[in-house]
From Swiss-Prot:
The modification N6-(pyridoxal phosphate)lysine is found at K236. Its EC number is 2.6.1.83. InterPro entries: Aminotransferase_I/II_large, DapL/ALD1, PyrdxlP-dep_Trfase, PyrdxlP-dep_Trfase_major, PyrdxlP-dep_Trfase_small. Pathway: Amino-acid biosynthesis; L-lysine biosynthesis via DAP pathway; LL-2,6-diaminopimelate from (S)-tetrahydrodipicolinate (aminotransferase route): step 1/1. It comes from Chlamydia caviae (strain ATCC VR-813 / DSM 19441 / 03DC25 / GPIC) (Chlamydophila caviae). The gene is dapL. Belongs to the class-I pyridoxal-phosphate-dependent aminotransferase family. LL-diaminopimelate aminotransferase subfamily. This is LL-diaminopimelate aminotransferase. It is an enzyme of class 2 (transferase). One of its GO terms (biological process) is lysine biosynthetic process via diaminopimelate, diaminopimelate-aminotransferase pathway.
Amino acid sequence: MQRNNNFSKLETSYLFSSIRQKIRAFREAHPDVSIIDLSIGDTTQPLHTAVMDTFTKSVQKLGNPETYRGYGPELGLSTLREKLSEVFYQGKVSPEEIFISDGAKMDIFRLLSLFGPGKTIAVQDPSYPVYIDTALLAGAKKVIKLPCRKETDFFPVIPQGEEIDIFCLCSPNNPTGTVLTKEQLEELITYANSHGSIILFDAAYSAFISDPSLPKSIFEIPEARSCAIEINSFSKSLGFSGVRLGWNVVPKDLRYSNGLPIIDDWKRFLHTTFNGASLPVQEAAITGASLFPNLEAIAHYRHNSSLLREALQKAEFSVYGGEHAPYLWVEVPKILPDEDFFDFFLTQYHIAITPGKGFGACGKGYVRFSSLGKIEDIMAACQRLTLTSVYDRMV
């Protein structure tokens, strides 16, 4: 059996797996040092009491012969799809256009696989590594990286003369923590509609947006229905990162170049490849959607971001993002070699972060801080950061 050649196109190891290995090695070499891990974007706040109550009752039903259920509907519980249409989209998206999944990461891969190999995929640079990896595994002909730099407020620069099949866009963005404005989204939507491209819009962090003028969904712009697919997740909004649940939206208006509706193929794809998300988790999400987002947890993470921003600025770092996202994109002084960023924060501050270059070439010169930690860890990190200026640490 020959190896799938697409694997040879990937980096040797996944970014966050490499970070975990480095942290583990440092802890083994320095057992007396307390490491604060602000590298991985995982949640730390518990599930809401009402969500937990529904979850528990639903699981208990599986232990009773009279209430036991096996497989659920592949496309998701109709009650949950209706609730999302009502609460999250205010009717702009119908329940029939919403599909419940086991998380955003799998949705990205499934949707790119739906369109088949040989496509040209554009991703933001810097960007979540999964977009590039899944595009390559799905057999993309070409992956184009769209530079997102501070000079353009991290808005992607679209290359001229390139025929792009699919744009992978994330807003609020991971890793920069910045948000696309309505005007910026309209520009991208106009481009996609005029060039026959599809926008794969990752809105997994939309619950963090507090400014009503900033779009939480690409479908707040009506013209997106003919060019966009949206992905979202309960991981950050309700703390479901450990139980896995998300959703995607494929509008009925979205069509192939031959006029056939994409939604029909998507249903066929899911019926073949997916048996549906966990029923107890979906039922818990129905309760959670009524609370959406879990404002107490979101407020906690926003407070963390505010504390980190203040501490980093006091230590003379330039900080971007973090106001409408759980990530802060931190520019590191140019006098420090790029490859030393991770080691610098680990050895000087005993804080683990994510080096920006792991998100792409345009991430060089930056690091990402996650505000999804516990408050005691955030406060301890802030104390370490503000002891001295970053420039004093480099002496």
